[in-house]
Amino acid sequence: MASEQAEAVDLVASDTVKQLSGAVLFAALTAVLAQFSIQLPGGVPFSFQPFGVFFAGLLLGPLWGGFSVLLYVLVGLAGAPVFSTGGAGVGYVLGPTGGFLIGFVIAAAVLGFVAHRSLTPESVVELSAVSVTAALLAGLAVIYLVGVPWLAAVQGITLVAAASAMSLFVVGDLIKIGLTVGVVAGGNELLADWR
């Protein structure tokens, strides 16, 4: 009796599995980082969740980075307490911070595209500090462009008043960008395999 060897069949390409795993990982990381937050007056907490958004876009690129943050938002919409201060559900997303959550999804995709100038990401260690900084600033601009008008509409205040309230966050967000650029620049060995 001749022995036949079973041939392995890939149902899903290994690159797709890697990207999906990365998206799930960064969705979880964003959820964990959201729990490190400080509630400020006005209903918008200062949190570390933008780090998850930044790294998802930079490391996974525009498609999978955006998908990762979308997954995070969908898990929160489904009721898991993954948003800042343990928030969850449709009511939370329709509240003052909902625009920022939507902005996070768009920002991850935009900053991933700006950084890589393509839908397919290259290794993040190949990116210059200037392109990483530009990408992060573009992502941050998207977050504010979606979040501030949403905040104004939900709170029933003027756009100027909402922008003024959010000005407290700008310095902290710029520090987050500086730290992210530093990690990318200094983490060559650790980050080299993410592409």
Model-derived features: positions:
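Alpha-helical membrane segments and adjacent membrane-interface helices in multi-pass membrane proteins
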Residues: 36-109
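Residue-level signature of transmembrane alpha-helical entry/exit and packing/kink sites
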Residues: 15-23, 46-53, 65, 92, ...
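Short helix-capping/hinge motifs at transmembrane helix termini and TM-loop junctions
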Residues: 34-38, 60, 76-80, 84-87, ...
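Membrane-embedded alpha-helical hairpins and interfacial helices in multi-pass inner-membrane proteins
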Residues: 42, 120-195
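Hydrophobic transmembrane alpha-helices
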Residues: 2-64
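Short helix-perturbing small/polar motifs within transmembrane alpha-helices
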Residues: 2-9, 18, 25, 32, ...
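Alpha-helical transmembrane segments in multi-pass membrane proteins
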Residues: 22, 26-30, 53, 57, ...
